[in-house]
Amino acid sequence: MASNHQHKDWLELRRDDETGIESVNAHFQGHAYDPHDHDEMLVGVTQQGLQRFHCHRSLHTSRPGRAMLIEPGAVHDGHAPQAEGFTYAMLYLPQRWVSDAMSRRGLGDASVLEGAFHSTLTDDPMLATAIHQAFFALHQGE
């Protein structure tokens, strides 16, 4: 899907045919999305602005450089608390791909990952950098 950066909200979606991983780069002002969940594991980074969302019955506020970690089935919403909105990069990791990757590396059954994220947001700069690098590699088709 191509983006249209002339409007206040925009979204670029790419899907890697080999892995099934989807990469989303998006910008929203005001209300972004209603409560929903995904079958995939989500890992992403806020790139610009403040991103506010409910997840796990808590209100979270992400700022540039923070990594977001959302398990499959975790209901979340989203909005921009500031007029300039927010921009983020997100990878949607299919559970089957995660399971296969863990198995290939001898890390056991992916079911151990159920609810595995200790925090929905983290300030770990190495993790945020790794997510960003993986995002750009997939999103740009490298």
Predicted regions, residues:
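N-terminal regulatory/effector-sensing and dimerization cores
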Residues: 3-111, 141
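Amphipathic alpha-helical segments enriched in hydrophobic/aromatic residues interleaved with Lys/Arg
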Residues: 105-142
